[in-house]
Regions:
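Core catalytic alpha/beta fold that binds nucleotide/phospho-ligands
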Residues: 1-104
């Protein structure tokens, strides 16, 4: 399952944590939240592996898009400048993610 959903970087990140399941759960929730914010859900051209959850140098969670997902978003918003805001939290055993896509 994890090899179908997560990138190699995400797997490495999660596996190096004390409680990997918690980190996988938050990242999975973020991918689902992004797909819903995009307005499509996961489908043919929207792949989990093309939505990577990472952290910036300050530890803030970020979404990195690649492949068909990046192209789909740019086409949908007509190549306008956009921002993706991501919030992750958990209250064991629950994981929660909120994604907002804004563009000008």
């Amino acid at each position: 399952f994890k090899n179908k959903i997560f990138t190699k970087k995400e797997i490495l990140y999660c596996e190096n944590k004390k409680n990997p399941a918690s980190f996988y759960a938050k990242r999975f929730a973020a991918k689902e939240a992004f797909a819903k914010a995009l307005g499509t859900g996961i489908r043919k051209n929207i792949s989990f592996k093309n939505i990577e959850i990472s952290n910036n140098r300050y530890g803030k969670p970020i979404i990195i898009l690649s492949g068909s997902v990046d192209g789909f978003l740019k086409k949908k918003i007509r190549n306008k400048k956009y921002n993706i805001y991501l919030s992750l939290s958990d209250d064991k055993p629950w994981a929660h993610a909120t994604v907002i896509i804004s563009y000008i």
